């Protein structure tokens, strides 16, 4: 790093090679220790720590934690036995000759010292306090690491894409409101009273227009905005690595994305084996109860619908019956099984049926007595359990029961310590349905259109080749050319082949119940562009915050965003959202009443 007006070196640049030389350093007082008239200070900057020794008591006396100081001194080796192998600078120290206090610090609301970062007694405050004082929270080494990692990942992605002849293009932030599956954030247009801009949920339509424009390979780190109900690990504003290509198919986009992912992970010291595995959406749901399966561990779901087809147990007289094995679960106390019932009810289920295989294969549990002798005798083999295991069941509609069992599978793995954050299990999920029922959207998705069907991904997704001629005749079974990239049970990103023909787009919109007039009003500019020669195109977007959090091993995406929002979109740091003044309301026209003009 280059020399500046305040320093000759950063902390971790002070090595044994500089012994006997003078250096000037600048940073925060991380920690101070006094030993018999000699003060030791750990000086912290963005690179790490270096130990400073102060023999002058008058020089050391005013220094406190988080004071910003500049020191000049001579580098020397630490005395034998005083080396710190945990520090990059652990073999040397700097003997201070002069110290200047550049800024003082009040007592901190919580400690940010590197020395306390990994100590159990260093209890961080609640997240609202951390976010209110985010500038202090970001001083912690783990947060500095996350921000640097995010930057390095972006650099690696850019290099990989530019090596593949992609062009970075910035798209507008003020656009027209278009249906994309969530609510828009809107901004009043002061110069056009009564009219509003929308902040983009994604650059979807704009990047398709770039394909029509002749930009054959586009990317950007795009800011996106979605006005969603609060969910634990979502943000109202987020970043995605957006990529689109012309004259390509699904295989081309997947191959390109794999190269980008490999480059990103390599920047952090990991090798990703290519090509990545694939699983169909149906197999993912059947085997793992999730369209974003965590493949760091096994224990797939077992379908028992056929096994229980003649069961006397009414609960299992359902369209779908499935199970997941709880290894060693027979030793679980009854109260813990009761807690599992509460866990299931919190997820909207009525409960969680179970049996245990005791000694000598004896079947126990509340479900056991309801099964026939034949069902009891063959159950252990049917589910692949062993003596000492337990088995959880779910019955009902296929999707709801599989989702519950999939959640059980992951919860079991979590409790068994199988979710290693440094193990990365990638997979593509392919062959998604084109549509899903409007009354069954994921979480708080807003259904696009006015029919019984809405888009599984978005309304601009191309039907698969086998379905192009008939998707509107059988929407329930129609399949799409779409694909998601999943890692460790998290959806990192998703993409699809896009519709580039106005006749196919019109048929998809018709299935969604979007009239021609509404389509022209919402996104007629895209349909108009298709009339002038739109090349086949496809793309994918990686959720950047999620991708960084996976590689960082962070508990939340908020830990890899510099200034995230808290629950409900609140910003404890700045106080946003906040009321605006009456003058601002009048200027922006948020209360504009067109009828008032007529009067």
Swiss-Prot record:
It holds the Pfam family tRNA-synt_2. It catalyses: tRNA(Asx) + L-aspartate + ATP = L-aspartyl-tRNA(Asx) + AMP + diphosphate. It is found in: Cytoplasm. Residues 565-599 are annotated as: Disordered. It is an enzyme of class 6 (ligase). Keywords: Aminoacyl-tRNA synthetase, ATP-binding, Cytoplasm, Ligase, Nucleotide-binding, Protein biosynthesis. GO terms for biological process: aspartyl-tRNA aminoacylation. Homodimer. Belongs to the class-II aminoacyl-tRNA synthetase family. Type 1 subfamily. This is Aspartate--tRNA(Asp/Asn) ligase. The gene is aspS.
